[in-house]
Amino acid sequence: MFDMPIATQNPQTRPFSIVLLTYAAILAGLLAGAPMAHASGEIGQASGLPVPRFVSLKSDRVNVRGGPTKDHDVAWVFTRAGLPVEVTAEFENWRRIRDWEGAEGWVYHSLLSGRRTVVVTARSKDEVVPLNDGADAAAPVTARLQPGVIATVRRCTGTWCRISGPGFDGWAPQERLWGVYPNEKVD
């Protein structure tokens, strides 16, 4: 139907393209070995902070909107301060966030805090997560946490996190916490 080519290349620029691609491949190889805070390694245009990243809700009432302006309808309201959310995008003063159940929406940046928190997760609703006295499954159990408990992150080793909350402080397996990335270290 269409006889026009989608893209054409000038034969005179071909050697330049090969050199450029070679340099790009070398640079990509060097950067692949560089440590990155998160899988994508992107920096948010609005904040200058990594995207994605975990933050927490500052308030007991946070409107989540369908888009990044007050003109967009409120899709739902969070009613739990300290809940961890993942910032997945930025637009001016708005942050697209994802909660631990996978729901996504837009929140005004001042309603978010850089304080790191986690939600305790379990493989079933009846399962509890042991909180140990040390970063070791053999360490004494100091508490058992129900799924949905919110805790403050004190430190993560990449496999264990020291967390605390009202009436508890100890170490939990990092894989059982939503609000920290796999293998992420937090000091």
Q: Locations of the language-model features?
A:
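Sec-dependent signal peptide recognition
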Residues: S17-A24
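SH3-family beta-barrel domains
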Residues: H38-G66, V77-A81, T88-F91, R98-W100, ...
